[in-house]
Curated annotation (Swiss-Prot):
Classification via SUPFAM superfamilies: Ribosomal protein L20
Function: Binds directly to 23S ribosomal RNA and is necessary for the in vitro assembly process of the 50S ribosomal subunit. It is not involved in the protein synthesizing functions of that subunit.
Protein name listed in UniProt: Large ribosomal subunit protein bL20
Entry keyword Ribosomal protein: yes
Organism this protein belongs to: Vibrio atlanticus (strain LGP32) (Vibrio splendidus (strain Mel32))
Single GO BP term: translation
One GO cellular component, as annotated: ribonucleoprotein complex
Protein family (similarity comment): Belongs to the bacterial ribosomal protein bL20 family.
Keyword match Hydrolase: no
Amino acid sequence: MPRVKRGVQARARHKKVLKQAKGYYGARSRVYRVAFQAVTKAGQYAYRDRRNKKRQFRQLWIARINAASRQNGLSYSRFINGLKKASIEIDRKILADIAVFDKAAFAVLVEKAKASL
């Protein structure tokens, strides 16, 4: 059985990890063993937070819609219920955008929701 030397592969693997760790503080960007742990943990955080981002944006949209609809005299849940009954299908992202940037149009939506309750 011939001897297998894996220096080239190991060097390439180490370079890849250290490249990913570029910009990290101290040994995390220089020492392979520490950098590997840091990069692995960063990947776990990234995976988790890609999912959390969707939840957080939905929470933000709901908070904005709730604030704007209460300014027009209607709670969030009654507003959404009114829109569903009026068969107005606008998602929360767009509703939040309208609430922030076009208050007059949002007021019209609130009136339509009130009318359909």
